[in-house]
Amino acid sequence: MKPAARRRARECAVQALYSWQISKNDIADVEYQFLAEQDVKDVDITYFRELVGGVATNSAYLDGLMKPYLSRQLEELGQVEKAILRISLFELSKRSDVPYKVAINEGIELAKVFGAEDSHKFVNGVLDKAAPQIRPNRK
């Protein structure tokens, strides 16, 4: 699958996970509704499903990975930033096929698109500290 389709999968995953985090609805329902209502013709649907399902299933684990590197309490973290960090940390910890730098750079780019004004700097700072602990070989 083309990198652009994966990027779109990540963008859609941020939106779906944001909705899930806010609504507390079943993740399968959120995923189904998102795919039914959004234009996803240029999206790697398989990867979107892997991200959404993987992040939802592993959210407590992923939150534990980010907690030591947050400058504030997890509960104070914005929902967009939380979704983005969860996706990037999922890719770093559970998707060895995603290169180290790609997982970090994609997280930063997602924060530029969806986050508040300086959230990309915050996401970069957290990932910059967490990533070497998750993948010491930086591959």
Swiss-Prot record:
Annotated InterPro entries: NusB-like_sf, NusB_fam, NusB_RsmB_TIM44
GO MF terms held by the record: RNA binding
Organism name: Erwinia tasmaniensis (strain DSM 17950 / CFBP 7177 / CIP 109463 / NCPPB 4357 / Et1/99)
Keywords: RNA-binding, Transcription, Transcription antitermination, Transcription regulation
SUPFAM superfamilies: NusB-like (SSF48013)
Superkingdom, taxonomy of origin: Bacteria
HAMAP family with a match to the protein in the record: NusB (MF_00073)
GO BP: DNA-templated transcription termination; transcription antitermination
Name of the molecule in the record: Transcription antitermination protein NusB
Pfam families cross-referenced by the UniProt entry: NusB
Keyword field contains Hydrolase: no
Functional note: Involved in transcription antitermination. Required for transcription of ribosomal RNA (rRNA) genes. Binds specifically to the boxA antiterminator sequence of the ribosomal RNA (rrn) operons.
GO cellular component, one term: cytosol
Family: Belongs to the NusB family.
